[in-house]
From Swiss-Prot:
Alphabetical list of PANTHER family matching this protein: CHLOROPLAST 50S RIBOSOMAL PROTEIN L22-RELATED (PTHR13501), LARGE RIBOSOMAL SUBUNIT PROTEIN UL22M (PTHR13501:SF8)
Protein name listed in UniProt: Large ribosomal subunit protein uL22
BP terms from Gene Ontology: translation
Organism name: Thermosynechococcus vestitus (strain NIES-2133 / IAM M-273 / BP-1)
Keywords: Ribonucleoprotein, Ribosomal protein, RNA-binding, rRNA-binding
CC terms in the record's Gene Ontology section: cytosolic large ribosomal subunit
Role of this protein: This protein binds specifically to 23S rRNA; its binding is stimulated by other ribosomal proteins, e.g. L4, L17, and L20. It is important during the early stages of 50S assembly. It makes multiple contacts with different domains of the 23S rRNA in the assembled 50S subunit and ribosome.
Gene Ontology molecular functions: rRNA binding; structural constituent of ribosome
Length: 122
């Protein structure tokens, strides 16, 4: 369990060229896991979203180590979410002079880590 008064370290990746729905699919499986378990899970998941999420998770752990002096072995993912970013708009030419709009979504990935409680509450 993660205590509410414990220090947390965050990391964000902005304007990632990926749909937030596809990123949330991975983040939902990581929320509440330990840092090491999350890294192992990300390594073997078959999704493209795992690469940027791994980078953000490592950055959050580095922030916790450098800024707060926490041990990475005790870290738990307290928050993990993906917000929608701006859509890049492109146009595909179609018949008779028409054009269809193609939206290329982006997202902002945020992960926060906190030290794990020593007293586990069931």
């Amino acid at each position: 369990m993660v205590s509410t008064s414990s220090p947390t370290a965050r990391a964000c990746a902005k304007y990632v060229r990926m749909s937030p729905h596809k990123v949330r699919r991975v983040l939902d499986q990581l929320r509440g896991r330990t840092y090491r378990d999350a890294l192992i899970m990300l390594r073997f998941m078959p999704y493209r979203a795992c690469e940027p999420i791994t980078k953000v998770l490592r950055s959050a752990a580095a922030n916790a180590t450098h800024n707060l002096g926490l041990d990475p072995a005790t870290l738990v993912i307290s928050q993990a979410y993906a917000d929608q970013g701006p859509c890049l708009k492109r146009f595909r030419p179609r018949a008779q002079g028409r054009a269809y709009q193609i939206r290329k979504p982006t997202c902002h990935i945020t992960i926060a880590v906190a030290p794990q409680n020593t007293a586990d509450e069931s």
